[in-house]
Amino acid sequence: MKTKSKGRSRPAYVAVAMMIGVAATVVAPAIAKDAFIPRLLNTSTVPSNGDVNPYGVAFVPEGFPEGGMIKTGDVLVSNFNDKGNTQGNGTTIISFSPNSAVAAPGTANTFFSSSLPGLSTALGVLRGGFVVVGNVPTTGGAFPVMQGALQVIDRNGNLVQTLTDATFLDGPWDLALDDHGTWAQIFVSNVANGTVSRLDVTVGAKGLSNIKMTTIAKGYTVAPNGPAVILGPTGLAFDAGSGTLYVASTGDNSIYAISNAGRATSAVQLGRLVFASSHLRGPLGLKLAPNGDLLTANGDAVNADPAHPSEIVEFTPWGHFVREYNVDSSQGGAFGLDAVLDSDGRFNYAAVDDVTNSISVYRLEARDDR
């Protein structure tokens, strides 16, 4: 969108490290594990073509093949609007390494330029060496939206294949991955028809094959919205341990859970209600945090509160509110986010700000003091 607690005792995620450089012949000391200043990077998401309104966010996972334009630990961001701020006209995925120089507006590195406009929050990276991104074009920047597609891109930013289907890929708005290397399940929220699909795919050297599509959930509210263009099912988060897929339904202002999502052969109606709270204000992006909690981005298109703009909300899978913070002092700034559990001390949490067309990336560490 482009418009200007108390919980159970368990690990919380707090920033603990800072970037320290080396000047002349002076050797920087080791970074203390209890450093106070967080390790944080904020950079523009605007590339040379002027695309704005960052939506999707994805870390490049461990095990991703070397030798391409992107590597493990890099961050990808998809842009929904063009330089004129027309919604559904953005065509770029930008990439950056959290250890590289901060990009000024207009200088963000372009990883992929699409011939299909309106790159959505549906952005993910497969360990087999491919990036998957959805697109949802608009009608002159407004409702109704068009069907769109999923595009598969190799590690050098080349388009490999385009997946379309009027039923199973009808406005691919967000996605979640269950990635097993040589095969994967891609869960897709369809904003145009209010459903969630699962794509079972084989991941090979040349792309995806043996693709089987199944609708696993239906009945989510779909409605036009001026600032957001359309409201419908958006964020998805998959818990591989339990087999549960969580769905952020923006129009319903609620989070639902689909049990046995990887094996379902028919569609449930919405799924089990997990979280419906005054803390929600049109949830968009949704991720499972390394501590087991869920994180969602409030888009402020529903239940808006000027005193609580652009918030990221943390809550448990049992529906208990934990914490919230705002990414911008204006409404409509929060959208895409990602969180990963890494083994090398890399940045592992990122969230975009649609108001400033930027992304903040953090290194968060587990602690048991909450």
Where are the predicted features?
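Sec/Tat signal peptide C-region and signal peptidase I cleavage site
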Residues: 26-32
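Bacterial N-terminal signal peptides
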Residues: 15-25
